[in-house]
Amino acid sequence: MARYRGPVEKLERRFGVSLALKGERRLAGKSALDKRPYAPGQHGARKGKISEYGLQLREKQKAKFMYGVSEKQFRRLFAEAARREGNTGVLLIQLLEQRLDNVVYRMGFATTRRFARQLVTHGHVLVNGKRVDIPSFRVEAGAKIEIIEKSKNNPQITRAIELTAQTGIVAWVDVEKDKRFGIFTRKPEREEVVIPVEERFIVELYSK
């Protein structure tokens, strides 16, 4: 299944939670979810009972759409998490958080992961001084992530940094906003990653 490219606000209304897909509109309380907090469609406001499988699938889809990964990428990450020693669900979240596009977003250089992915693919991001244009590139602890010199005054990046001042930066990165670089200091603990996803249902889904 390819990466979703449709109307992102419909996804948030379908799931009933913010997936951080519309950064500035969400912060301003102007997103479609804020205005219409129910699923789109004629019967969107109705709440039906969801099956166990439906719940498992729902959590997987939320994670996929939030991090902007395809089904193939998601399965590959889950398989890697399952092979490692430890809690598979927690390891999966950590692997998703280590994606370069996500780290750029977490550092506050983009209002959404989608824009962060564009910054990476268009060559605006350096990792340890080298240009990397692969959004799925895995960032390891201690890596320096920097916006290239000619893009440091990009108005969208500047606006993202201004908005980040309202929400704060996550604990596992250190950022020099004025210099447009940051350090990915460590992998996050699960309780630090505030996302509307219950990964245990994803583990149950793929363990069948």
Curated annotation (Swiss-Prot):
Domain named S4 RNA-binding: residues: 98-163
Gene Ontology CC terms, in alphabetical order: small ribosomal subunit
Alphabetized UniProt keyword annotations: Ribonucleoprotein, Ribosomal protein, RNA-binding, rRNA-binding
InterPro entries: Ribosomal_uS4 (IPR022801), Ribosomal_uS4_bac-type (IPR005709), Ribosomal_uS4_CS (IPR018079), Ribosomal_uS4_N (IPR001912), S4_RNA-bd (IPR002942), S4_RNA-bd_sf (IPR036986)
Gene Ontology MF terms in the entry: rRNA binding; structural constituent of ribosome
Single Gene Ontology BP annotation: ribosomal small subunit biogenesis
Record-linked Gene3D superfamilies: Ribosomal Protein S4 Delta 41, Chain A, domain 1, RNA-binding S4 domain
Subunit structure: Part of the 30S ribosomal subunit. Contacts protein S5. The interaction surface between S4 and S5 is involved in control of translational fidelity.
PANTHER family given in the database record: 30S 40S RIBOSOMAL PROTEIN (PTHR11831), SMALL RIBOSOMAL SUBUNIT PROTEIN US4M (PTHR11831:SF4)
Cited function: One of the primary rRNA binding proteins, it binds directly to 16S rRNA where it nucleates assembly of the body of the 30S subunit. With S5 and S12 plays an important role in translational accuracy.
UniProt family annotation: Belongs to the universal ribosomal protein uS4 family.
Protein's recorded name: Small ribosomal subunit protein uS4
Species of the source: Campylobacter jejuni subsp. jejuni serotype O:23/36 (strain 81-176)
Gene coding for it: rpsD
